[in-house]
């Protein structure tokens, strides 16, 4: 292996060219991801299902494609959301939705609770579109998963996107890398060696 690398180590210019080529591949992938994020209006336009809470609709390891340009989330729609203070996307179905032009369907009790809530950055307003979610394979709704003191999700603040398509099982690679950090180092090492060995 070192014998194969010897020509590159003895030729700094060629080695630098290979490193730049590797950096170009990474930057192209990054720009593609950012472009997709802008188009879908989602910070994470592609996510992986991490649990079995949405079976049988989605299995662990399925790769989901998201769209976040709709102002509302309808009952029955599958959304991905982030819990405040956590960085783990959750894929669940909307079972209740109200607010932001729902025709005044809120209960008086809910309106009173909203009137008592403070307003400010990161907090839902009484006019925001709010939803309640639940995993298809779960018995209870997601209230216990939300941030402390949060009864519902805010469509604008908490939702990453709505599911518009998926590819089964492809995301298992991501799960394996997340559960085994050493595999990331090995994978990057292999990619680096492959680029170094690539001849123009």
From Swiss-Prot:
Signal peptide: none annotated. Glycans are attached at residue 105. Residues 118-128 have a biased composition (Low complexity). Its main location: endoplasmic reticulum. It comes from the Eukaryota. Its EC number is 3.4.21.89. GO terms for molecular function: serine-type endopeptidase activity. Coiled coil: none annotated. Residues 186-197 are annotated as: C-terminal short (CTS) helix. It catalyses: Cleavage of hydrophobic, N-terminal signal or leader sequences from secreted and periplasmic proteins. Residues 1-14 are cytoplasmic. Residues 34-200 are lumenal. GO terms for biological process: protein targeting to ER; signal peptide processing. It is a single-pass type II membrane protein. Catalytic component of the signal peptidase complex (SPC) which catalyzes the cleavage of N-terminal signal sequences from nascent proteins as they are translocated into the lumen of the endoplasmic reticulum. Specifically cleaves N-terminal signal peptides that contain a hydrophobic alpha-helix (h-region) shorter than 18-20 amino acids. Belongs to the peptidase S26B family. This is Signal peptidase complex catalytic subunit SEC11. It comes from Arthroderma otae (strain ATCC MYA-4605 / CBS 113480) (Microsporum canis).
């Amino acid at each position: 292996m070192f014998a194969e690398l010897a020509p590159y180590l003895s030729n700094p210019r060629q080695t630098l060219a290979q490193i730049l080529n590797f950096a170009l591949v990474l930057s192209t992938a990054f720009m593609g991801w950012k472009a997709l994020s802008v188009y879908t209006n989602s910070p994470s336009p592609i996510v992986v299902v991490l649990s079995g809470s949405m079976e049988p609709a989605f299995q662990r390891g399925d790769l989901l494609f998201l769209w976040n340009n709709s102002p509302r989330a309808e009952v029955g729609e599958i959304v991905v959301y982030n819990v405040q203070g956590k960085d783990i996307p959750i894929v669940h179905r909307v079972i209740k939705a109200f607010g932001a032009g729902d025709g005044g369907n809120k209960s008086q009790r809910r309106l009173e609770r909203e009137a008592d809530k403070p307003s400010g950055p990161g907090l839902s307003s009484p006019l925001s579109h709010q939803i309640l979610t639940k995993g298809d394979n779960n018995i209870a709704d997601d209230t216990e998963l939300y941030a402390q003191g949060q009864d519902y999700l805010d469509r604008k603040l908490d939702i990453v996107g709505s599911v518009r398509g998926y590819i089964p099982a492809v995301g298992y690679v991501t799960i394996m890398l997340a559960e085994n950090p050493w595999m990331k180092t090995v994978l990057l090492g292999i990619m680096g060696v492959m680029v170094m060995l690539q001849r123009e």
